[in-house]
A protein has these predicted regions:
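Periplasmic c-type cytochrome electron-transfer domains
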Residues: 3-5, 14-363
Length: 363
C-alpha cells in the first residue's frame, strides 16, 4: 500500500489518488514530519506517562497512519463490583497505558487489585487512514441508522455516541468507543495520553494543558496540532483491490445476505459523495455472554463502534483487543447482537466461507 493524499472538495474515494509525499501541500508535509517525529524528554515527552515517542510508533501498519500490532496494545481498568455493577472509573483507569502489556493472545493477564480494579481491557491501535472522509459524514447520517429499540426486531440495535462538548451535543465517530468527534480532538487527546505532551486549551476537553515535568506548557503549539490534524485529514482511505474474481463477487453477496452489512454498512453519504468505509459508526454489543469491560457515559460495557472494514486485510489482529488472530476468528468472535449473523456464517459451506473471506481481503 502506498501513502496517498486526498484533495477534499474534489475527492474520488476509489481509484488512484495524488501521492502525499511532496505533493505541493506544505501543511501536509509538516504534519507528516510531526507524525513521524520521535519526541524527546527535553521537549516534554512522557509526563505523566508515555506509550510511545511518536505517532508513527503505533500507527504504522501497513503504512504511516495505519494500525498497530498486538504488542502495541494499551490497557484501561476500572471496577464493576465483581460483575454486579455499577462500573466505577478509578484514578488512572481511563488513561490508556502500556504499563500492563498484553499476552501474545491478547488476553488480559494482570495482577488483581491494581488500584482496586477488577476489570481490565485491552485496546488495539486503530488505523487513521481515511479518517478525513469519515469526518465529512454528517452526524445526521450516522444517527439516521440508529435502531435503539430494535424496531425491525432483527436483534441488532445500533446507538450513536453522543458527547457533550463545550455545552453542545456532538456525535462521536473515532475511537473504539466512538469517544472522539473530531480529528483535532483525537490529536489533542493522543498527544497527552499517548505521548505525554501538552497542547493548548481550546475548551473542548481533549487537551492536556499541564503536566509534571519542567518543560513549559503547552509543549506542542496550536500550529503543530493543526498540521498533524491536516495530515491525518488528508490521508486517503485504503483502496479496494478491485478483484473481478467470481468468488469475490459471491463473497460480497454472502456478506449482504447473512447480515454483515447491517452494521458494516458499505457506504455512508457525505457532501463529497459516498464514503465506502463499511461501517455505520454506531455502537453495538457483539461481545460474548458475561463479558466485562470498560463502561463510559453513553457507551456501556461491551459496546464498541463498528470498525470500518476498508483495508481490513492489513490490520490483523482483530476486535477491540486483538483477540481474533485472523478474519475467520473475527467473524466467530461476534456474539450478542451479531449472534444470528455468526450462526449464519457457521452454516455456510466451506466454499461460501472462503468466498466471504476473499471479499473481505479485497476491501
Amino acid at each position: 500500500m502506498q501513502l496517498s493524499h486526498i484533495a477534499l472538495g474534489a475527492v474520488v474515494v476509489t481509484g488512484a489518488l495524488m501521492q502525499g509525499q511532496g505533493g505541493g501541500d506544505p501543511q501536509f508535509d509538516r504534519g507528516r514530519a510531526l507524525f513521524d517525529k520521535p519526541f524527546s524528554l527535553v521537549e516534554g515527552l512522557g509526563a505523566p506517562e508515555m506509550n510511545a515517542d511518536s505517532c508513527r510508533s503505533c500507527h504504522q501498519d501497513p503504512v504511516i497512519g495505519g494500525a498497530g500490532a498486538l504488542e502495541l496494545n494499551v490497557s484501561l481498568f476500572g471496577n464493576d463490583n465483581g460483575g454486579n455493577g455499577p462500573f466505577t472509573s478509578l484514578p488512572g483507569g481511563p488513561t490508556v497505558s502500556k504499563m500492563f502489556p498484553p499476552s501474545i493472545h491478547g488476553r488480559e493477564e494482570y495482577p488483581t487489585g491494581v488500584n482496586g480494579a477488577d476489570v481490565f481491557e485491552q485496546r488495539q491501535t486503530p488505523s487513521v487512514l481515511g479518517n478525513g472522509l469519515i469526518g465529512q459524514i454528517p452526524s445526521t447520517v450516522i444517527t439516521a441508522n440508529e435502531d435503539v429499540n430494535d424496531a425491525d426486531q432483527d436483534g441488532i440495535f445500533g446507538i450513536a455516541r453522543r458527547l457533550t462538548i463545550a455545552g453542545n451535543i456532538e456525535v462521536g465517530r473515532f475511537g473504539w468507543k466512538a469517544q472522539i468527534p473530531r480529528i483535532a480532538d483525537f490529536v489533542n487527546d493522543a498527544m497527552f495520553n499517548e505521548l505525554g505532551l501538552t497542547t493548548p486549551e481550546n475548551g473542548r476537553g481533549f487537551s492536556g494543558i499541564t503536566d509534571a515535568d519542567n518543560v513549559s506548557d503547552p509543549e506542542i503549539t496550536q500550529a503543530e496540532v493543526d498540521d498533524i490534524t491536516h495530515f491525518i485529514t488528508m490521508l486517503s482511505p485504503p483502496q479496494r483491490g478491485g478483484s473481478t474474481a467470481p468468488e469475490v463477487a459471491a463473497g460480497e453477496a454472502t456478506f449482504e445476505s447473512i447480515g454483515c452489512a447491517k452494521c458494516h454498512t458499505p457506504s455512508l453519504a457525505s457532501p463529497l459523495g459516498p464514503v465506502p468505509l463499511f461501517s455505520n459508526l454506531l455502537l453495538h454489543n457483539v461481545m460474548p455472554p458475561n463479558f466485562r469491560g470498560i463502561a463510559e457515559p453513553g457507551a456501556a460495557s461491551g459496546f464498541y463502534r463498528t470498525p470500518p472494514l476498508w483495508g481490513i486485510k492489513d490490520t490483523a489482529p482483530y476486535m477491540h483487543d486483538g483477540h481474533a488472530e485472523d478474519l475467520r476468528g473475527a467473524i466467530l468472535a461476534h456474539f450478542n447482537e451479531a449472534e444470528a449473523v455468526r450462526i449464519a456464517y457457521e452454516q455456510l459451506s466451506t466454499t461460501e466461507q472462503d468466498a466471504l473471506i476473499l471479499f473481505l481481503e479485497d476491501l
